[in-house]
Regions:
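Long, charged N-terminal interaction/targeting segments
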Residues: 1-77
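Cys/His-clustered metal-coordination modules, chiefly Zn-binding fingers
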Residues: 75-125
């Protein structure tokens, strides 16, 4: 049975736009099958900059199915009074950040993503 925190998070995302603040939930991983990182950004108004961002990572397992991470994400959203949630339906790239974790165009750790479009996973180069 699906954990209640995971269920609540998915339900919030399905509800659509309910007002501001808005939370964005994006999943990242070493490939298209395992999400090792989730990042949540908070926007307080339309066309505004992201006010805060937080991420969660796992060395093993998948962040999309971890009830503890789902609970912490919900608590983070509640602390910011989030009314709307948008969530990616797939992994959208490498969990490492260009310019922070590595220099250059492609992550040296995640060979899978080399030459791939981060949103589709399709090879572009």
């Amino acid at each position: 049975m699906e954990d209640r925190f995971l269920k609540r998070l998915r339900k919030k995302a399905r509800r659509g736009m309910r007002g501001w603040p808005l939370a964005t939930v994006a999943f990242y991983g070493p490939n298209l099958s395992r999400a090792s990182k989730v990042a949540v950004g908070i926007f307080t108004r339309e066309n505004g900059d992201m006010e805060e961002i937080r991420d969660w990572k796992l060395d093993t397992g998948d962040v999309r199915t971890d009830p503890g991470i789902a609970r912490e994400i919900l608590e983070f959203m509640e602390a910011h009074g989030v009314l709307s949630v948008t969530m990616t339906d797939r992994i959208i790239g490498c969990p490492h950040q260009e310019g922070i974790d590595y220099e250059g165009e492609w992550c040296p750790v995640c060979d899978f993503w080399r030459g791939r479009d981060r949103f589709t996973g399709q090879i572009v180069q």
